[in-house]
Regions:
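Conserved glycine-rich cofactor-binding loop
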Residues: 16-17
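Short C-terminal tail/terminal secondary-structure segment
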Residues: 92-95, 146, 223, 234-248
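Substrate-binding pocket helix/loop in short-chain dehydrogenase/reductase
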Residues: 96-98, 102-110, 191, 203
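Active-site helix of classical SDR
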Residues: 121, 157, 165
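Alpha-helical segment proximal to the catalytic Tyr-Lys
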Residues: 126, 169-174, 231
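Residue(s) in the substrate-gating loop at a strand-loop-helix junction
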Residues: 141
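C-terminal helical subdomain
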Residues: 180-183, 201-229, 233, 240-242
């Protein structure tokens, strides 16, 4: 089945490192023109150079509607459209029991992990995909499908993102396919506190496949869903966790 993205254009939020950068690299390798966006200009520029393939960048606060509109407009201006939107940017400023969370960090987590993906999707739909079709990919988490004593606030936002995926898939069909990817523990800087040292080995041993995920694992799934290979998939939350959901 075809997994080429020749002639396609993509916008990846949080695309300067980790999962977002790997997805952007996978898309450019498959022939797409990609715009990445993240907060720091120097990090975006360096990432775009490493990604190659004519990757462009637009720095700014991914939760700021003004930046969203600027990045979307520039992507359409430079590439002619946005066939694929990847809502990857996320934050996790609080770890601990959800009942003890303070309001500022609660609101920040919701703003970045739920409100921002909705606004990015809404703007891309209104400015391009409503009339041209496309694909939306939301990077959620297995945390959105289960409970965790220390990550409740983060997990609630990812559960919301998963349901948002299903709702928007129903609303935007047949023009746009909307799917979520739910990674388990991936070896990124974002999740370093969970996998560095003995903790990562302990988690890996709980997975039937006995290893932690790599960013390339997520990029491969994103490519499958974005390309024609995923043309009959929408409204799904695809779990990539080394079998963690089925462990004994």
């Amino acid at each position: 089945m075809e997994q080429s993205l020749d002639g396609k254009t993509a916008l990846v939020t949080g695309g300067s490192k980790g999962i977002g950068k790997a997805i952007a690299k996978g898309f450019t390798d498959a022939g797409a023109k990609v715009m990445i966006t993240s907060r720091k200009a120097e990090v975006c520029e360096s990432a775009a150079d490493e990604i190659g393939g004519g990757c462009e960048w637009e720095a700014g606060n991914v939760g700021n509607p003004e930046h969203m509109e600027q990045a979307i407009d520039r992507t359409i201006e430079v590439f002619g459209g946005i066939d694929i939107l990847v809502n990857n940017a996320a934050t996790n400023p609080y770890a601990g029991p959800m009942i003890d969370a303070d309001l500022p960090r609660w609101k920040k987590t919701i703003d970045v992990n739920m409100t921002a993906p909705f606004l990015w999707t809404q703007m891309v739909w209104q400015k391009y995909q409503k009339h041209n079709g496309g694909v939306i990919l939301n990077i959620a988490s297995v945390g959105g499908l289960e409970t965790n004593p220390m990550l409740g606030v983060y997990d609630v936002t990812k559960a919301g993102l998963i349901h948002m995926t299903k709702q928007l898939a129903a609303e935007l069909a047949p023009q746009v396919r909307v799917n979520a990817i739910c990674p388990g523990l991936i070896k990124t800087d974002f999740a370093r506190m969970l996998w560095e040292g003995d903790g990562g080995d302990m988690v890996a041993q709980q997975y039937p496949l006995k290893r932690l995920g790599e960013v390339e694992d997520i990029a491969a799934a994103a490519l499958y869903l974005a390309a024609d290979s995923g043309s009959w998939i929408t409204g799904q939350a695809i779990v990539l966790d080394g079998g963690g959901q089925i462990k004994f």
